[in-house]
């Protein structure tokens, strides 16, 4: 359970870094909004997954 959360966090950080490197200050606000939207969706699905398999710990 902890490993999954750590992996997800690492993945999000790497994704943000790669996006920031690829888009230097061009449309940054719009980009951030898009990232937050995707991030919320990912977090929601991750919560569902961890919720359904939470009894295994």
UniProtKB/Swiss-Prot annotation:
Major localisation: secreted
Subcellular location: Secreted
Expression across tissues: Expressed by the venom secretory cell of the spine. The spine is a cuticular structure containing a single large nucleated venom-secreting cell at its base. It is an independent unit capable of producing, storing and injecting venom. On the back of D.vulnerans caterpillars, spines are grouped together by 50 to 100 to form scoli, of which there are eight in D.vulnerans.
GO molecular-function term, one example from the UniProt record: toxin activity
Keywords, sorted A to Z: Antibiotic, Antimicrobial, Secreted, Signal, Toxin
Alphabetical GO biological process terms: defense response to bacterium
GO cellular component, one term: extracellular region
Family note: Belongs to the limacoditoxin-2 (cecropin-like) family.
Name of protein: DELTA-limacoditoxin(2)-Dv11
